[in-house]
Regions:
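Conserved core segment of the aminotransferase class I/II
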Residues: 1-7, 25
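Alpha-helix capping and helix-loop boundary segments enriched in small/acidic/polar residues
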Residues: 7-11, 37
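Mobile "lid/hinge" segments at catalytic clefts and subdomain interfaces of large enzymes
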Residues: 15-17
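Non-catalytic terminal extensions of PLP-dependent enzymes
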Residues: 28-173
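Substrate-binding rim/cap in mid-to-C-terminal beta-strand-loop elements of soluble/periplasmic
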Residues: 20-22
Length: 173
């Protein structure tokens, strides 16, 4: 076949990759490195601050990419009237997209939350997110009765979430 003309298909997934190439060319290696370093620095800051919060454990001790996950401490989760799904809902009321979901097969007992720090996410925004997490925890700890997601976990029933959940049941730890 004779192909005389070709053009890139800028569907959504390809657009992100092309955008990264453009940024790399525009900023140069050093500029792009600084952008990534800033994202990583903010991710490490949020990771460390979440690790200091009583209910949480970070899944890993180190942050090597501008993303990380955490989960409820098992001893905290046993007594809590809420789950990370409830925290996800509270944060979404303030405009944050911090998903809670189960890990894949053989780790599906863990419900985790994930933060991905994107380019342009500032230290001020990180402080706002951390403040909203702390406020949401304070509200959730005042509950008199368990939330529906907490009751579903207690009964080992599937939890309906707004985020992908690997189709697994959640188990209490």
């Amino acid at each position: 076949a004779n192909i005389t003309q070709g053009g890139p298909n800028c569907s959504r997934p390809a657009a992100l990759i092309l955008g990264q190439y453009y940024q790399f060319i525009r900023l140069g290696f050093q500029g792009y490195k600084e952008v990534q370093y800033n994202s990583l620095t903010i991710a490490k800051y949020i990771h460390d601050e979440i690790g200091k919060m009583a209910p949480f454990v970070n899944y890993s001790d180190e942050v090597v990419n501008p993303l990380f996950i955490w989960y409820l401490k098992p001893e905290y989760a046993r007594a809590a009237k809420w789950t990370l799904y409830d925290l996800q809902d509270k944060l979404s009321q303030h405009g944050w997209m911090v998903p809670a979901y189960t890990l894949p097969s053989k780790l599906e007992d863990y419900v985790v939350m994930r933060v991905v720090v994107r380019q342009g996410f500032s230290r001020d925004m990180a402080d706002m997110l951390l403040g909203d997490i702390k406020n949401a925890i304070t509200e959730l700890e005042k509950l008199d009765y368990p939330t529906p997601t907490r009751m579903a976990q207690e009964k080992n029933l599937p939890v309906e979430t707004k985020i992908f959940n690997h189709g697994c049941r959640t188990h209490k730890k």
